[in-house]
């Protein structure tokens, strides 16, 4: 009988330790877009998200990025759009065109492209997804390009031209957009 009690206790303790890493891993990102309270990074965009009137040619679900305004618009039904602040490509890294969302990822890994590594050999060759990853909480991959609409581990750069061509958003805003935008959605990038 004593052997069964020890065996049962051992199994319970073993299960506690076996599930602890999974619990820690899931709790690390449980708050999809909110850094810990000890983190000094701002939690909100310096440019608040808002619903604005829209009377243009694009259908609901279309994403319009106006890089000169540093704003992204998600077209809604009823002649409205959600407007978000974004960070855009710095001089020499701006672009314009029409594409679509090819893929979406939560807490994406980041592998800098070869061109970026040539410019910045100090960068890691690969970084797993997480709060310190430059892609932030979500990424929407733009078809036919190396660019993404993604979160950021530097939310204070929203409203600035600092990226290598990607469109940066706060983790809160990119999580909101990620839930609303579908794979295949049209993306129009204007200068």
Question: Can you annotate each of these PLM segments?
Answer:
Residues 8-18:
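Bacterial N-terminal signal peptides
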Residues 19-25:
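Sec/Tat signal peptide C-region and signal peptidase I cleavage site
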Residues 16-18, 56, 65, 133, ...:
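Generic structural signal for beta-strand residues in well-ordered domains
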Residues 1-4:
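Positively charged n-region of N-terminal signal peptides that target proteins for export
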Residues 6-9, 31:
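Short helix-onset patch at the extreme N-terminus, typifying the N->h transition
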Residues 78, 83, 92-98, 105-191:
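Exported/periplasmic cell-wall-interacting domains
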Residues 26-115, 129-131, 138-140:
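Cell wall/extracellular polymer interaction/catalysis modules
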């Amino acid at each position: 009988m004593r052997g069964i009690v020890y065996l049962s206790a051992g199994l319970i303790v073993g299960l506690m330790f076996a599930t602890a890493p999974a619990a820690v891993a899931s709790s690390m990102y449980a708050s999809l877009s909110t850094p810990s309270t000890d983190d000094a990074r701002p939690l909100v965009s310096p440019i608040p998200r808002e619903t604005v009137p829209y009377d243009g040619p694009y259908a609901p679900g279309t994403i319009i990025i106006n890089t000169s305004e540093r704003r992204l618009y998600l077209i809604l039904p009823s002649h409205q759009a959600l407007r978000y602040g974004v960070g855009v490509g710095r001089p020499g890294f701006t672009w314009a065109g029409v594409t679509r969302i090819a893929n979406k990822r939560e807490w994406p890994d980041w592998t800098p492209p070869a061109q970026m590594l040539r410019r910045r050999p100090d960068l890691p060759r690969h970084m797993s997804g997480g709060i310190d990853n430059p892609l932030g909480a979500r990424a929407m991959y733009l078809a036919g390009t190396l660019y993404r609409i993604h979160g950021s581990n530097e939310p204070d750069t929203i409203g600035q031209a600092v990226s290598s061509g990607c469109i940066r958003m706060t983790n809160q805003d990119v999580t909101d957009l990620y839930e609303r935008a579908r794979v295949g959605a049209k993306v129009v990038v204007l200068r």
